[in-house]
């Protein structure tokens, strides 16, 4: 077990106490109509919608405060997914079973994978947070508000490697760790007032399958994959701009191929054996990580063969291998340096019914003492940046563009 630091102890005490004002109203983000963002009172005359108590979930766009960068969220109806793949599916791996049933509540899912345009805004916080003048007074991180703070990713150690195949604002952001992806979702939640997070593995597969049971969301004819995915047969030069292939029946692009996408779950080579029989809720089905390594990514990437882009295909992160060229000690909690990390990205999810403070915290923060120690050690040494997503931050982001 690694040494704990005083700042970590203070953080945990604050976390046990409560959220402070910065995050107290995340569930109350409103549209111009006064309803929650993405909710309309009347049934829309056209376009996708999901009927829920009190209104209708509809697609919506958000502009990241301080920028002109937008992202779209698509409503997905609740339902039940049979997680995993049948024994006779071509290309199946042993970790894709046994199949288990999970009930999914209505959610919004990012129309596309998160882009460099979005993620570079978050990366820019490092410079802002390192400015002691801007981070003074009420904006200074202390033991009482540390629970609301976010860490910003350090500058890339090997940008030429990460961006070898491009850094177009519409290409998917890649090489971030799961911890960094989780912190991004906490940051964008604080900046917009809506509760964003990574999907659970069950939510991801439900969104990818879009009420299908075939190998792909369009069926099992692999010859059709070309129209829906960027994979090794058609994308030798890296990930493509998001949304440039056909969407699945839910209207989501790139659920097959382009880049693998982080989920919140830890990986088990036993697949879904722990879920047993019967229908589980989303929360019951989460396999929270029990070690610092091995988290689940889904969907396949541009470097992968067609069978790895199936709706049920899984892959485990491997920190030691994926950070093989990282010279830092401890290794970066925010970045990977080695393939297949250049085909690993993320996608946002938002629940129709906001999660409890206790549960959303698990989606946002480190979930293992080794990651916690690495982060806090770097911050104490001045090799990390910590700050609060306050309203003033939007103006500084604008100045930093």
Indicate where each model-derived feature is located.
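Positively charged n-region of N-terminal signal peptides that target proteins for export
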Residues: 1-4
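Bacterial N-terminal signal peptides
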Residues: 10-22
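Sec/Tat signal peptide C-region and signal peptidase I cleavage site
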Residues: 25-28
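Active-site microenvironments of metalloenzymes and redox enzymes
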Residues: 30-37, 83-90, 103-218, 264-272, ...
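Surface-exposed recognition segments
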Residues: 31-35, 94-102, 212, 236-238, ...
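Primarily auto-inhibitory N-terminal propeptides
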Residues: 31-62
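Functional-site microenvironments in short loops/helix caps that host divalent-cation chemistry
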Residues: 82, 86-87, 159-320
């Amino acid at each position: 077990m690694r040494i704990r630091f005083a700042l970590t102890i203070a953080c945990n005490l604050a976390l046990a106490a409560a959220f402070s004002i910065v995050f107290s109203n995340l569930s109350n983000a409103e549209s111009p109509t006064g309803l929650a963002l993405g909710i309309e009172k009347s049934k829309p005359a056209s376009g996708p919608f999901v009927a829920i108590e009190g209104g209708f979930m509809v697609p919506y766009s958000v502009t990241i405060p301080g920028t002109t960068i937008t992202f779209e969220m698509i409503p997905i109806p609740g339902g039940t997914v049979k997680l995993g793949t049948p024994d006779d599916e071509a290309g199946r791996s042993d970790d894709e079973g046994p199949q288990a049933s999970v009930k999914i509540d209505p959610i919004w899912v990012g129309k596309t994978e998160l882009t460099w345009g979005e993620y570079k805004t978050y990366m820019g916080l490092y410079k802002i947070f390192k400015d002691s003048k801007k981070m003074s007074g009420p904006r200074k991180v202390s033991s009482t508000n540390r629970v609301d703070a976010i860490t910003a990713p350090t500058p890339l150690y090997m940008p030429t490697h990460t961006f070898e195949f491009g850094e177009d604002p519409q290409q998917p952001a890649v090489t971030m760790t799961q911890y960094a992806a989780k912190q991004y979702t906490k940051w964008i939640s604080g900046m917009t007032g809506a509760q964003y997070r990574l999907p659970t593995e069950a939510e991801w597969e439900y969104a990818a399958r879009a009420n299908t049971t075939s190998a792909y969301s369009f069926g099992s004819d692999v010859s059709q994959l070309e129209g829906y995915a960027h994979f090794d047969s058609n994308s030798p030069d890296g990930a493509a701009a998001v949304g440039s292939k056909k969407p699945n029946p839910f209207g989501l692009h790139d659920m097959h191929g382009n880049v693998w996408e982080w989920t919140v779950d830890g990986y088990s080579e036993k697949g879904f054996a722990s879920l047993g029989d019967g229908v589980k809720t989303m929360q019951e089905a989460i396999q929270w990580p029990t070690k610092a390594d091995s988290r689940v990514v889904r969907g396949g990437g541009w470097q992968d063969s067609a069978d790895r882009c199936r709706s049920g295909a899984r892959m485990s992160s491997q920190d030691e291998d994926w950070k093989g060229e990282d010279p830092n000690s401890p290794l970066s909690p925010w970045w990977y340096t080695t393939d297949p990390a250049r085909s690993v990205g993320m996608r946002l999810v938002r629940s129709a019914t906001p999660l409890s403070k206790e549960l959303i915290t698990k989606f946002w923060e480190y979930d293992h003492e080794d990651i916690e120690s690495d982060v806090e050690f770097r911050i104490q040494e001045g090799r990390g940046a910590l700050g609060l997503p306050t309203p003033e931050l939007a103006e500084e982001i604008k100045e930093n563009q």
